Design a protein with these regions (language model features):
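A short glycine/small-residue-enriched secondary-structure motif
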Residues: 44-54, 61-69, 87-98, 104-113
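Structural motif
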Residues: 58-67, 178-181, 318-327
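Short helix-capping/linker segments at secondary-structure and domain boundaries
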Residues: 79-84, 198, 309-315, 335-347
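Short, well-ordered loop/turn and helix-capping segments at boundaries between secondary-structure elements
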Residues: 92, 123, 224, 304, ...
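Helix-centered, glycine/charged polyanion-binding patches within enzymatic domains
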Residues: 224, 230-321, 325
Length: 350
């Protein structure tokens, strides 16, 4: 069995709790990331890794405890640090060492150890399993019913420079256009429950592939109301969507901006009672579109956490698989955060 961490720290770590309280009052971003990594998500990943992780090293460098490596990996992903940056962070910050169960008297975790554990996560597809586990926990808690969902995609930028050894860009990335702006990189397509924000479906693809082509990979067939933006117009007629065994599904797709301009111009050209009736009709449609957007906006919060709070607006590695594995881990952490908010008792207001 794996040895347990007894919690005993060195004299250099005695003041860690005091420093932690001071930094928490000053809104330290890294301390906030540690506070979000609760024991439940750490234990879930430990249980997934335990049957596959080596327990004892017969020769060579002594093995690193599984709990320590899980904490280091999740903290590294949450802070969007490279392997070398994470090694330096553990060496210089006693609060991080205390969180990761690493004492100053022990050997520091090297960047190669962090690298190998990340490859271990990618090889066994543990990030996908962690996301599926969070979805099942949310379904048990009643936070994810798959009835009212929203789907969308977002760009993850990649380096467009060719000043490297191969004199070429990443062959798995591509260029895509949005709002007259070109982006080089990949896209993360997700589907989430509109009520709780729990993400249950993800697909990674190059940036030049349209969002509508991956909608069939996100839906399960249990959905009853699907909220989409104007880029998904006509999705119900596609062959891959018709093959999904929906029981009774309704599509709520946003109207194109050009339709709004046309209706406004027509209503402005008419006067009298007819013009007033057209204006009222346009206002009713505006309210309907606003209602659909208010439901669809729940999926935008996941992109806010992915790209701004977790800082994953640019890819870390070459290729889709490694970057998608990192995004899956972040989506699983976001699901745990949303599930805690869902299960928390409502705050009383005076």
């Amino acid at each position: 069995m794996e040895e347990l961490f007894n919690g005993q720290l060195s004299f250099a770590d005695i003041e860690a709790e005091q420093f932690l309280q001071i930094r928490r009052t000053h809104a330290d971003r890294r301390v906030n990331a540690m506070d979000r990594l609760t024991d439940d998500v750490i234990n879930e990943l430990i249980q997934l890794c335990l049957p596959l992780y080596h327990i004892k090293a017969n020769h060579g460098r002594p093995y690193t405890r599984l709990e320590t490596m899980v904490r280091v990996h999740l903290l590294q992903v949450s802070l969007n640090l490279s392997d070398l940056e994470m090694e330096s962070y553990l060496a210089s910050d006693m609060v991080a060492r205390s969180f990761c169960r690493v004492s100053s008297t022990h050997q520091f975790i090297s960047d190669s150890t962090i690298l190998r554990f990340r490859h271990f996560i990618e090889q066994h597809r543990l990030a996908q399993k962690l996301l599926e586990r969070t979805v099942s926990l949310a379904a048990e808690a009643g936070a994810c019913s798959f009835e009212m969902v929203a789907a969308d995609g977002t760009f993850i930028e990649a380096p467009s420079s060719t000043k490297n050894k191969a004199h070429a860009r990443d062959p798995e990335m591509a260029s895509g256009k949005k709002a007259n702006t070109w982006h080089f990189g990949m896209k993360e397509h997700i589907a989430a429950c509109s009520e709780s924000g729990i993400i249950y479906g993800t697909v990674a693809a190059p940036a030049n592939e349209h969002d509508i082509t991956h909608l069939g990979d996100l839906l399960k067939g249990l959905e009853k109301m699907v909220f989409l933006d104007s880029g998904y117009i006509g999705c119900a007629k596609r062959a891959e969507i018709q093959e999904i065994p929906f029981k009774d599904v309704s599509w709520y797709i946003a109207a194109k901006p050009s339709a709004w301009k046309k209706e406004l111009s027509i209503s402005e050209n008419f006067g009298g009672e007819l013009g007033q009736a057209l204006v009222e009709c346009v206002n009713v449609k505006r309210q309907l579109e606003h209602a659909k957007a208010s439901v669809r906006c729940s999926i935008e919060w996941s992109f806010l956490w992915l790209k701004r709070i977790y800082g994953y607006a640019k890819v870390r590695y070459r290729g889709l698989a490694k970057n998608h594995s990192r995004a899956l881990t972040l989506f699983a952490l976001y699901n745990c955060y949303r599930l805690r908010k869902w299960c928390a008792p409502p705050e009383l207001s005076c």
